[in-house]
Swiss-Prot record:
Role of this protein: Catalyzes the reversible conversion of 2-phosphoglycerate (2-PG) into phosphoenolpyruvate (PEP). It is essential for the degradation of carbohydrates via glycolysis.
Name of this chain's protein: Enolase
Involved pathway(s): Carbohydrate degradation; glycolysis; pyruvate from D-glyceraldehyde 3-phosphate: step 4/5
Position of the signal peptide: none
Location of this chain's protein in the cell: Cytoplasm; Secreted; Cell surface
C-alpha cells in the first residue's frame, strides 16, 4: 500500500501567460509527482467552473490563489493519509465535498489538478506507464492527430471567425509518420504564406494566423501545402474544421454572422441555422473535409439534429461546447440524435474519473472520441497518455509549433516507441471520404 503524505498547490503560468494551477503530490514512499491544469478561450456555458480570484490588481483578475488555497486547505485535509490507488473513490470524495453541480466551491481547476496528480502518483508507485495504469493491458491505440495549422476565431487576431482549420494524416501507417507529414505540411504552408505576403505569426495553438478573405481561402492554402509537400489531399491527408459557432451566434436574431469581419468593417456574411448547415454542406462537397466541430451554437439542439440528419452519415459531427465532456449532456445528445462524435476536454468536467466515464458512454453508443487540449496549455502531456489509455483513436493538440503543443506529440512518439510491435495507429473516424 502507498499513502498520500502531502498535497500542495501552486500558481504557475500557462502558454498565454495567464495563471493556472499546478499540484505537487508526495506519497509516504517519497514518490513525488506534479500535474498542471489547462484553460480555454472559447468555453461552453455548462463547463465546470474554473475558479479565478477576480482581483483586478492581481493578474487582471485571473489569479488562482483561491483555488490554490482550497488545495492546500480542505482538499489536502481530505486526501492526506488516503491510498493513492483509490482514484475513483477519491475523485468522488472531492466531488461530494465540493457539493456543487459545477465544482464551483473548490474550483474545477483545483479538483482536476489533484485528480491528475493522483493518477500520476498511482502509476509511478505501481511502476507502470501512465497510459497502462489508466487503461490496462489493452491500451495500445495511437491516435490520429487533428493538427490545427491555420488559427482563427478566439485563438487569433485575424478576420477568420472559424476557429480551427486542421489536417488529419489518416493515410499514415504510424504515429511517427503522421507527425512527420504534419510537420512537413506545416513548414510548406509557412513558405506559401510568406511568398504570398502573409504574416506567419502563430496563434494560441501554434497554427498560422494570416488575415484571409474567407474560409475557402484558408482551405485552398492548406490543400496547396499538402500537395506541395508531396501528399494526396483526400487520400493521405484530409481536412477538419472547428467552427466554434457559439462565438459568432447572435441569440437575439438567431443568426450566425461573421463577427470579426464586421468588427473590422469588412463585408460579412449572416446566416440562419439552415443556411449555416447548407454552407457547411457545400464546403464538404468542395473540399476533402471529414470532420466538423461545433458547427452550430451550443444551445441550438434542433439545429444540431438537422445538421446530423444532413451530414451525420457522411462526416464526423463533433460536439464540444454542446456536450462539455459531461455525461448528462452527452446522454441528451444520444437520445436526440445529435452529433456522432464528442470532443473530450479534461477541464470541462474536472476529474479523471468523470472524463473516463464520458468516454465509455460515448464509445458504448458508437460516438467517436477526440481527446483535446485547450488554447491555454502547459507543458503537461497527460492528455497523450489518456488518449492511448482510452483507445480513443483521435487527438487534437494543436499545430507543429510551440513547446506546449509539441510536448503532447513527443509524449505520443515515446509511447509508440515503448509499445513497439503492439502499437497500432488507426483513425477512429469511421467516415472515409475517399
Amino acid at each position: 500500500m502507498s499513502y498520500i503524505r502531502s498535497v500542495k498547490g501552486r500558481e504557475i503560468l500557462d502558454s498565454r501567460g495567464n495563471p493556472t494551477v499546478e499540484v505537487e503530490l508526495i506519497t509516504d514512499q517519497n514518490v513525488m509527482v506534479k500535474a498542471s491544469v489547462p484553460s480555454g478561450a472559447s468555453t461552453g456555458e455548462n463547463e465546470a467552473l474554473e475558479l479565478r480570484d477576480g482581483d483586478l490588481n492581481y493578474y487582471f483578475g485571473k489569479g488562482v490563489l483561491k483555488a490554490i488555497a482550497n488545495i492546500n486547505g480542505p482538499i489536502a485535509q481530505i486526501l492526506v493519509g488516503e491510498q493513492v490507488y483509490d482514484q475513483e473513490r477519491l475523485d468522488r470524495m472531492l466531488i461530494e465535498a465540493d457539493g456543487t453541480d459545477n465544482k464551483g466551491h473548490f474550483g474545477a481547476n483545483a479538483i482536476l489538478g489533484v485528480s491528475l496528480a493522483l493518477a500520476r502518483a498511482g502509476a509511478l508507485t505501481a511502476n507502470l506507464p501512465l497510459y497502462r495504469y489508466i487503461g490496462g493491458v489493452h491500451a495500445h491505440l495511437l491516435p490520429c492527430p487533428m493538427m490545427n495549422i491555420i488559427n482563427g476565431g478566439a485563438h487569433a487576431d485575424n478576420s477568420l471567425d472559424f476557429q480551427e482549420f486542421m489536417i488529419r494524416p489518416v493515410g499514415a501507417s504510424t504515429l511517427r509518420e503522421a507527425v512527420r507529414w504534419g510537420a512537413e505540411i506545416f513548414h510548406t504552408l509557412k513558405g506559401i504564406l510568406k511568398k504570398a505576403g502573409h504574416v506567419t505569426a502563430v496563434g494560441d495553438e501554434g497554427g498560422f494566423a494570416p488575415n484571409l478573405s474567407s474560409n475557402e481561402e484558408a482551405l485552398e492554402l492548406i490543400l496547396l501545402a499538402i500537395e506541395k509537400a508531396g501528399y494526396q489531399p483526400g487520400k493521405q491527408v484530409v481536412l477538419a474544421m472547428d467552427c466554434a459557432a457559439s462565438e459568432f451566434y447572435d441569440k437575439t436574431t438567431k443568426q450566425y454572422f461573421e463577427k470579426k469581419k464586421k468588427q473590422k468593417n469588412q463585408v460579412f456574411a449572416e446566416r440562419t441555422a439552415e443556411e449555416q448547415i447548407a454552407y457547411l454542406e457545400t464546403l464538404c462537397q468542395n473540399y476533402p473535409i471529414d470532420s466538423i466541430e461545433d458547427a452550430l451554437a451550443e444551445g441550438d439542439w434542433c439545429g444540431w439534429q438537422r445538421l446530423t440528419e444532413r451530414l451525420g452519415r457522411k462526416i464526423q459531427i463533433v460536439g464540444d461546447d454542446i456536450f462539455v465532456t459531461n455525461p448528462k449532456f452527452l446522454e441528451k445528445g444520444i437520445e436526440l440524435g445529435v452529433g456522432n462524435a464528442i470532443l473530450v476536454k479534461i477541464n470541462q468536467i474536472g476529474t479523471l474519473t468523470e472524463t473516463l466515464q464520458t468516454i465509455r458512454l460515448a464509445q458504448t453508443n458508437n460516438y467517436a472520441c477526440i481527446i483535446s487540449h485547450r488554447s491555454g496549455e502547459t507543458e503537461d502531456s497527460i492528455i497523450a497518455d489518456i488518449s492511448v489509455a482510452a483507445n480513443t483513436g483521435q487527438i487534437k493538440t494543436g499545430s507543429l509549433s510551440r513547446s506546449d503543443r509539441i510536448a503532447k506529440y513527443n509524449r505520443l512518439l515515446a509511447i509508440e516507441a515503448e509499445l513497439e510491435s503492439t502499437a497500432l495507429y488507426q483513425d477512429s473516424n469511421r467516415f472515409q471520404i475517399f
